[in-house]
């Protein structure tokens, strides 16, 4: 899928409020009023739901772009992965089970998760997921600011009925969950990388570790 997308697919169809800060030019790269560099991979989900309907199960990944200031955990270009499941009788329990399975398969059986309430316009309810720090096993260390928890790992929630409706799916019959994660951030947690900029600096000695 192209890196450019319609403003409508990136925001309007995903139930983003008209005054949501992510719509601002300070957050999103605009070509013109209708075309932007995608700030998330969610427009792929919109296209898939509109073209294929429900039931649907999908994973998509790719580069996304946001007008972020560069620091140890932020980059104006990064990689995102999203998952979407829409079917009859899909519940929050299905979402939690799926993500717990992923975390334990990827980071290890000993890693615990914490689901916190959050707000995303395209899901309701919405949650953020943390994991116990992989450096100290949750005991508390400098890497996790002595909290025992790693940085926010991913966002997720039940697909908002308005999003289903916007994509031609009946929310009275179908429900679904979605999750999204920064691939670079996942790699940082797994491989104990302290600065996201290291991934984009073409440092051969660093890259050869992988």
Question: What does each model-found stretch correspond to?
Answer:
Residues 4-210:
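TRNA-recognition modules of translation machinery and tRNA-sensing kinases, especially anticodon-binding
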